[in-house]
Each structure stands twice: as C-alpha cells, then as structure tokens.
Amino acid sequence: MALRFPPRLLSQLKLSRRLNSLPAPVSEDSEDESLKFPSNDLLLRTSSNDLEGSYIPADRRFYNTLLKKCTVFKLLIQGRIVHAHILQSIFRHDIVMGNTLLNMYAKCGSLEEARKVFEKMPQRDFVTWTTLISGYSQHDRPCDALLFFNQMLRFGYSPNEFTLSSVIKAAAAERRGCCGHQLHGFCVKCGFDSNVHVGSALLDLYTRYGLMDDAQLVFDALESRNDVSWNALIAGHARRSGTEKALELFQGMLRDGFRPSHFSYASLFGACSSTGFLEQGKWVHAYMIKSGEKLVAFAGNTLLDMYAKSGSIHDARKIFDRLAKRDVVSWNSLLTAYAQHGFGKEAVWWFEEMRRVGIRPNEISFLSVLTACSHSGLLDEGWHYYELMKKDGIVPEAWHYVTVVDLLGRAGDLNRALRFIEEMPIEPTAAIWKALLNACRMHKNTELGAYAAEHVFELDPDDPGPHVILYNIYASGGRWNDAARVRKKMKESGVKKEPACSWVEIENAIHMFVANDERHPQREEIARKWEEVLAKIKELGYVPDTSHVIVHVDQQEREVNLQYHSEKIALAFALLNTPPGSTIHIKKNIRVCGDCHTAIKLASKVVGREIIVRDTNRFHHFKDGNCSCKDYW
C-alpha cells in the first residue's frame, strides 16, 4: 500500500520508491559506512510534477507525519526506512520522536524493535512507558505488559488512565483474576476508579472471572458511561447465563442513548440460545433490524445458532441467506443446524455447496456433516466424508471417531463399529464406547452392550448415563436380576441418575416440569388434558411401551408411571396455554424415551399442531403423526 500524504509533502512521496531500493536499515552504531543511508540533503531533494526541484527541510512535524502514516496503514518496512533517516538527523535523541517511533513499531506488531527503541532512548516519560505497555497488552504479550508496568512504578513514573486500562486488560488476558482487586485498589488510590476507560477494563476483567457483584460496583461508580462499559457488563452477564439481567441492561443502554455493538448483539443472542429465551432473542433481533445494523458474520453467526437451537431451522436458513459476508463459521453454523435437526440430505448438499464456492471445510465442518449423516441413516455418505476428511489432511479427533461409531452403530453394523474402535489410532475414550453402548440399546444387543458399558465404567465411573442405558437394556430383555445388579452398583458407588425435566417458554416465562409433577398450580387441568389426548392416541393404536420404566413393578403401575413423564406434562401444559394451531417448543435435559416419542408423534396428529422437542441428542419435529427423525434416532 502506498503512503498518502498531504499535497505539501508530495515530493516526499518519492522516498518510499527511492528508499525501497536501498540497503536495509542498520543500527546507528554500525561501523560499516557503506551500509549507512545517504544524507538528508540527497534524500529530501525529490521531484514531482508541481514541485520540480523544490527543497523542503525535514522537521519534527514532517517525520511525525510520515511515521503516523506508517502506523495507520501498518507500513512496517517504510517505517524502518523513516527510522533510519531519523537516526541521521538532529532528532535521533528527541523524546517525542522516540515515542512516535515506539508507537509505530508497537502498532505494527514489531514488539522487539519497539523494545530496542525503548532501551536506546536516553530520556523517557510516562508516554514512553504507556506506549510500550499498551503494545504488549494489545499483541497478546500480557506478561511483558505487567513486567514493564512494575518497572515503570519502580522508576517513579505515574500511570495515566490509558496505562492502567492496558495493564488491567493484560491481567485479564493472563488469567490473573486475583490481581483484579489489587489493580482496582491501585486505581482508587490514583483517582482513576471513576474513569470510563479504566472502569471498562475493570468491568471486562471482573466479568471474565464471574465476579459480577464487583463488576456492578465498578459500573455504578463510573462518573460517565460509554458504549464500551455498557457492552462489557452486558457481555459479562450474557456469558454467565444471566440472560434476564443482560436483557435488562440492554434496555437501560438504549434508554441512555448508547448504540449496541455487534459484540453486544452476539453476546445476547448467545445467551438467549443457551437459556432458551427465543422470544427475547427475537425482540433483540427486531431491534437490530430497526436500527439499520448490517448482519455481519460475528453477530449473524450467533443469531443463526440461536434460531437453530430454538428449533427454528427455517429462520436459521434465512439468517444465513442475509449475511453480508459468510466465513467458515457461518457455513459450519448452518451445517450444525441441519445436523441437529436431522436433515441429513440438506446438510450434505450444503457441505458440497460450501466446497463449490471455495470455502475449505475444517474439522468442525466434517464433524457436522458426519453427525448429520449419522442422524439420518446415510451410512455410505458418512463413510465417504470420513475418508475425504483424511484425504484433505485433517487428522480425525476423538469426536470424529465418536460420530463414526455412532454412524455404524445406528445403521445396525455393530460388529463393524467394534472393529473400527479396535483399529483406531487413538485410545478409545468413554464417549466412543458410549456411542457403541447407545447403538446396542437401539438394536437390543445385550452382550455387546454389557461389554461396551464395562469400558465406559472403567473410563468414566461417575457418569450415570451409561448405567441407566445398561439397566434399560437388561430391563427391556426381562433380565431383572442383571438390571438390579446395575442399580445396586450405582447405589454403592454413589452414582445418581440425573433427574429428568422438560420446559416450555410461554409469554417470556420458562415453565419447568419433572416426572409426576405435583407442584404446578394447573396440575389438575394438565392431568385432565393429557388423559384427553391419551384417549385419542390410543384410538390411533398407541400402546404404552413399558420397557422404558426402570423400576420393577407390575404392568399396570408401569403404564401409569409412563404417562407422567416430564415431556408429556409439558405438552399438556402447552396445549392449555398456547393458541390453537401454534407451534409448541419443548426442551428436555436428557434423551426423550421411546414411549414419549411415539406418544408425542401421534399427539401431533390428534391436536393438529407441530411439536418441536429438543433433547440432548437432537431436535424432533413432530407433525401430522410423523417425526423428522423418521424413527431413526
């Protein structure tokens, strides 16, 4: 990139062209005169169309202008050339010139050269120290930033707000949360605790380590607030799943007239995604559109993920289509969305489209398409992409192997899945054996299931999931003694099954239910509603699958137990409290059991609604008596 200078300095534009052909700059102490640069007189006698033969003597302002241009446009080579000429001038020991050079090298990322300038400066002031500290902080050298800050204090220099904000950022990056209170106290001592720049840095440090009360105290103490301080606090609460507080602060920020950044939007979309606050996320998205913000990749990718995780795959696709620019994260987000929703053929099509437009798939891309193939029964396609990944030079990681085992296992090729595990170049992880165990549950292979379970217990004895799966395998085969042995082992080792719960969001409120829930104020209406639905689905052929009841009781009691699983209660509640014909969204913290899957599938037909259920494995779109998974899950 060429330097662009004011008209008065057009003649000096020839410097870059002329000097690029000269030797590389050398130290001012070099004894080799042949490597020295020509004199200032020769260099500054340049020609241009309008300043033929004119002479402009170099002064501090001239050199500063050159260096600032080099800094702005990150022209490190030209900056070195200017530096070499300063060394031949009367400004070689000038403190202002030294600070400008130091800043140029630091901003261009050449920190070693910046440090050499610093060390050779005969005089330094607080600007000198601050510039070097800021350079280290901005270029991921937090240890050096903290080291030079300590030296600065030892030499008796007083920091300003920019010094302190850089040091606080360095402490945050260095994961020295313990330094936060010490630095905060130092800022109070120096009188900078209410400064907006220092306060914003402290906010970021405290929120990174979850010290939200301390962050709020800093925020409240600020004499004035800017968009950085607002965004830092919003992002902090969003990261810590304080979605409601983050949304409350977002509204306060708007009332105070500040403009949200793309970082704020991304934080809020991410928080709404992780906590299931779809309606609030839609409101933030609507405000973003109203304010005229472009949907750039950073916030757009998070918004796409929010819609996908909330069950709105079509909205996720719309966001992808509207992105001003798509990066590999954008494509991966779309692929992951299709994988989670079980749309394997669509994921395969978009993966090929990604390659066609020149975006090189990475390890996440391949993981997503493998997952999509696994969830859709696309065995041949999945194996093709596993081989393609290796051809593309991407070394499979543990999660890729998990997905391939899942792919083979779901397809019923359990022996091939076992051989694949035994021949892997890595030691099988608990997750890999668990994938085989799940496949054994699906295909009722008791012996191989027990073999896989033993490996999981050895590698991850505290995970209750594999114990429950093995119990269900034994129970479904009528092997109650073996099932009882599993329960006894769980009790003796202190492993407890995670309580199942389901929840729905209605009118910006989350309603959570557990099995046999007796606490809800509408419990009687909920029970009547489910009995009504149950009678209708039985007319369509529903028969309770009592193999999913993990307690050994008589058949009648097992059937009663089945009808009060948390997802069925959540469905009945949603039917009572949402408009007829509207889509119902239910989320569950563990895998949906087979009986509930069948019941909800038939319920979608008798109530005439689309019901979207998200569990830990995937999304199920129930509509007109069918499920998007095609019962392959």
Curated annotation (Swiss-Prot):
GO molecular function annotation: RNA binding; zinc ion binding
Transmembrane spans: none
GO (cellular component) term, any one: mitochondrion
Ranges where the record places region Type DYW motif: 539-633
Keywords: Mitochondrion, Repeat, Transit peptide
Any single Pfam family the record assigns to this protein: PPR
Positions of region (Type E(+) motif): 508-538
Region annotated Type E motif, chain positions: 432-507
InterPro entries (alphabetical): DYW_dom, E_motif, Pentatricopeptide_rpt, PPR_At4g14850-like_plant, TPR-like_helical_dom_sf
Disulfide bridge map: none
PPR repeat positions: 94-124, 125-159, 160-194, 195-225, 226-260, 261-295, 296-326, 327-361, 362-396, 397-431
Gene Ontology terms describing biological process: RNA modification
Transit peptide: 1-63
Domain of life: Eukaryota
Locations listed in the record: Mitochondrion
Major location category of this protein: mitochondrion
Family: Belongs to the PPR family. PCMP-H subfamily.
UniProt-recorded name of the protein: Pentatricopeptide repeat-containing protein At3g24000, mitochondrial
Annotated source species: Arabidopsis thaliana
Phylogenetic placement of the source organism: Eukaryota, Viridiplantae, Streptophyta, Embryophyta, Tracheophyta
Gene this protein is translated from: PCMP-H87
